[in-house]
Swiss-Prot record:
PANTHER family: TRNA 2-SELENOURIDINE SYNTHASE. One of its GO terms (biological process) is tRNA wobble uridine modification. The active site is at C97. It comes from Salmonella paratyphi B (strain ATCC BAA-1250 / SPB7). InterPro entries: Rhodanese-like_dom, Rhodanese-like_dom_sf, SelU. One of its GO terms (molecular function) is tRNA 2-selenouridine synthase activity. The lineage of its organism: Bacteria, Pseudomonadati, Pseudomonadota, Gammaproteobacteria, Enterobacterales. It catalyses: 5-methylaminomethyl-2-thiouridine(34) in tRNA + selenophosphate + (2E)-geranyl diphosphate + H2O + H(+) = 5-methylaminomethyl-2-selenouridine(34) in tRNA + (2E)-thiogeraniol + phosphate + diphosphate; 5-methylaminomethyl-2-thiouridine(34) in tRNA + (2E)-geranyl diphosphate = 5-methylaminomethyl-S-(2E)-geranyl-thiouridine(34) in tRNA + diphosphate; 5-methylaminomethyl-S-(2E)-geranyl-thiouridine(34) in tRNA + selenophosphate + H(+) = 5-methylaminomethyl-2-(Se-phospho)selenouridine(34) in tRNA + (2E)-thiogeraniol; 5-methylaminomethyl-2-(Se-phospho)selenouridine(34) in tRNA + H2O = 5-methylaminomethyl-2-selenouridine(34) in tRNA + phosphate. Its EC number is 2.9.1.3. Monomer. This is tRNA 2-selenouridine synthase. Residues 14-137 form the Rhodanese domain.
């Protein structure tokens, strides 16, 4: 363990997907964690709050004594067994608390008493977090090329095919539109930023990187927003625009939002509950933009959606969804994106069908 306890290269730890046994309270972990970290707290939220109050009123020694009283006996043993099991599963892992202080040192000492020598992250999560922020800022200074195009143009697929492509929507677990949620909940803002930083570091380490290829995104992807340093660079970046036939875009959207999402919901929850969740997902997507559609148009499209769902449930056909998807694209999504693109017209360096854009990227 001695070599692992020397001055730590935080970037190397992140690049290596180093397992982290994060002993912070669940609320701290939920607010922000590193990719692949597992949360096995020394103290739960109420215990941590009690110790914090004691620290403010009576000082460090009293708080430490209270912590040991709260985490003792069977509770201590149960948590110790969980840490031991985690270390046996991840023998190259590290302990991590907020700043590399009391909590990780206490767990390290308790493990050592059982014969396990587990290193800890010096500086804790805060040090790793700062490394992630600095890495994103530094790597965002490299040239960026954006892939643009209306909804259903296959932009995400194109980005994923590039060795220097960064799938921002995949990292955010959201596809950007009001229908963009997936079955996986979005990460907290800090966790999303940490995951993005690690992805940038990994791609940069794999190759001599001339530039990043990213999808042309707004400030936010669902509940997550892009780091300002990256957003500022994207605002100035050149754009290659995918211009595919409307019918081809419809087929991509049919596959993504009706066929695949129905499959994913029923696979996760079973036929009946999955159908209910799928139906609610589509209704929620439409409801989210009701004010922009106008309440009368929203009501009309909702009725059409209900009929399409009834048809899909009875026959399996998704054709009925085109009756509300087509006007939604024509009246809302396409005009909105084209308006946004017009403001960046000077940045457009290439236009063409999906395959032409793919070939152009390959030639760069």
């Amino acid at each position: 363990m001695q070599d692992r306890q020397k001055a730590q290269d935080y970037r190397a730890l992140l690049l290596a997907d180093t397992p982290l046994i994060d002993v912070r309270a669940p609320i701290e972990f939920e607010q922000g964690a590193m990719p692949g970290a597992i949360n096995l707290p020394l103290m739960m939220g109420d215990e941590r709050a009690a110790v914090g109050t004691c620290y403010k009123r009576q000082g460090a020694d009293a708080a430490l004594a209270l912590g040991h009283r709260l985490v003792c006996g069977d509770i201590r043993q149960q948590r110790l067994e969980a840490w031991k099991a985690a270390y046996q599963r991840f023998p190259n892992g590290y302990l991590c608390c907020a700043r590399g202080g009391q909590r990780s040192h206490i767990v390290q000492r308790w493990l050592k008493e059982t014969g396990i020598d587990c290193p800890l992250i010096e500086g804790g999560y805060k040090a790793l977090r700062q490394t992630a922020i600095q890495a994103t800022w530094q790597l965002a200074q490299k040239p960026i090329l954006l892939i643009g195009g209306c909804t259903g143009s296959g932009k995400t697929q194109l980005v994923r095919q590039q060795p220097n492509g960064v799938d921002l929507e995949g990292l955010a677990r959201h596809r950007g539109s009001s229908f963009g949620r997936t079955l996986k909940p979005q990460l907290s803002q800090a966790s999303f930023e940490n995951k993005l930083a690690v992805e940038l570091l990994k791609i940069n380490a794999r190759q001599t990187l001339k530039r990043w290829v990213l999808e042309d995104e707004g400030r936010t992807i669902g509940a997550n927003h892009l780091p300002e340093c990256l957003r500022e660079r994207m605002a100035q970046a050149p754009i290659a625009v995918v211009e595919d036939p409307f019918a081809l875009r419809l087929e991509r959207l049919r596959e993504e939002y009706f066929i695949r999402m129905h499959h994913d919901f029923t696979h996760a929850y079973g036929d009946e509950a999955g159908w209910q969740a799928y139906s609610e997902y589509l209704h929620h997507g439409l409801f989210a933009i009701r004010r922009r559609l106008g309440l009368q148009r929203f009501a009309e499209l909702t009725d059409t959606l209900d009929r399409a769902l009834a048809e899909q449930l009875s026959s399996g056909s998704t054709d009925g969804h085109m009756a509300w998807l087509v006007p939604l694209l024509n009246e809302y999504y396409d005009p909105m994106y084209r308006y946004q693109l017009e403001k960046k017209a000077a940045n457009i360096v290439f236009r063409g069908p999906w395959q032409d854009v793919a070939n152009w990227l390959k030639a760069q």
